[in-house]
Amino acid sequence: DDPDVFRKQFEKKVTKVMKRDGYRIEELSHELLMKFTIDTLGRCVDVQYPDSLGGVRFNPTQRSRELLNTALSELNPFTPAYKDGRKIPYVRKMLINMNFLPGAFVKPTFRGKKDGLMAFREYLNRNLVYDTKLYEAGVYGTVRVEFYIEPDGTITLVGASESPHPALTEHVQKLILDTSGQWTPLLEMGHPCRYLISFPVNFDPG
């Protein structure tokens, strides 16, 4: 069977079983390795979850194993492998990233708005002040600031990778810091995670 076709069918089945059987996203592992044998009848047997691959460690939760086992058992039988005209068992190994599940990866939001970055840009546009002296001196361009949204919704500044003037950098960074605590953080598999943003702010005299 085509590996890509199988993966799509399997992901669809996993999603269906998750919804049907009431699995919660926070119970599941983000990434895991699955190994199974397709026997001569086309059934998936001897399902295993190796704990490493090329130095990468895996620690799948019990609920993740249960979900994948159920989904695998409900797939249509495979076409068995053949060698010299005879059916033979075939071992398949798959690295599974659960990002395809609903709610597996939820981007940060600002002040409860669905489009967090758009709401953040609107906030900046309302509060930006273009210093008159800099404007008259022809200082313009893009201030690009990097910052983290922490798991608790606070802000940690990294710095500015681009800026036409330190005063503009300071102004933008202050506005960003003022939003600390007003963010809902990135959620991966239901768990709050640190998230890096590189955000451009344009100062245009025209």
Named regions from a protein language model:
Residues 1-206:
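Charge-biased low-complexity segments
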